[in-house]
Structures are given as C-alpha cells and as structure tokens.
Amino acid sequence: MLWLLRHGEAADGSPDSERPLTEEGERQARLAGEALKRLGVEIAACLTSPKVRAAETARLTCEALGVEPQQEPKLAGGPFDAEALAAGLGDNVLLVGHDPDFSMAVHAMTGAQVRLQKGGIAAVDTGELSVLLRTTEIEAIAQ
C-alpha cells in the first residue's frame, strides 16, 4: 500500500524551501506516526521531499515507526509518479510531501478527487483509495 502524508503546518516566510514546521505542525507529524503505529501499519520505507517542512514531518512521523526517511527530490514540487517512486521498496511505503501535488497523485492513481489537508494521510492500494484521514481522525486514532 502507498501512504501519502502531506507535511504539517509550516511557518510563513521565504525562501519557501526553508520554511520549518510550527509547533502545531510538529504535533501533527508526531500524531501521524502514532496513528499509523496504532493502526498496525508497518512502513518499509519513507521517501520525503527535501523541503524543510516535509523533511521535518517525515523525521518526526518516522520516529514512531522505526524507519529512516530518505530524501527524494521528485517530491519537492510538481507532478510525480508515486507508484514508480515506491516500486521495489516494500509493501507499505510512506511518501511525505506537498499539495496540490499529493492530491493530484491520488487522483492520477485512483480517479478520486481529494484535497489532503496539512498533516492529512491518504493510502492507495492497487488503484483504490483505501484510507483518507484528516487531522481530527489522526488525532483520535493516535490517542
């Protein structure tokens, strides 16, 4: 299954690539990791955008999952082939990045029109949208 996590809330400022997470964004990232762990999701690999807010989200999320995130420049912005990036990395691969790119990737794989909120998670399995979690659901699962 392919899991897509949009980065948590980020601070304003520029340059865009260096915007860090806010305290709320850090909380969202930790909760995402705890929620995936409680759901029994065993992430085999994590690929993240190199932009600071996404890399921080991946690091904090993966602490709970026991996985070391790897930076993937193709997730830094613009269209990408999520399935090609995840190919050969294991059964459950977590991608961490940005919108509208992630919502467009979900649409490309499933035909579903979604809008991932900051800190939100979508999971796609063989062309089907299997999971779509907003931060409120993630928080409830993680607690």
Which residues make up each language-model segment?
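Active-site-proximal alpha-helix that buttresses catalytic centers in soluble enzyme cores
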Residues: M1-P79, A87-G88, F102, A112-G120, ...
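Domain-level recognition of soluble alpha/beta enzyme cores
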Residues: T110-Q143
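Short, charged, surface-exposed secondary-structure boundary motifs
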Residues: P79-E83, V124-G127
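Short, surface-exposed amphipathic charged segments that create phosphate/polyanion-binding patches used
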Residues: A84-G90, E128-V131
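A glycine-rich beta-strand to alpha-helix segment
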Residues: D91-A108
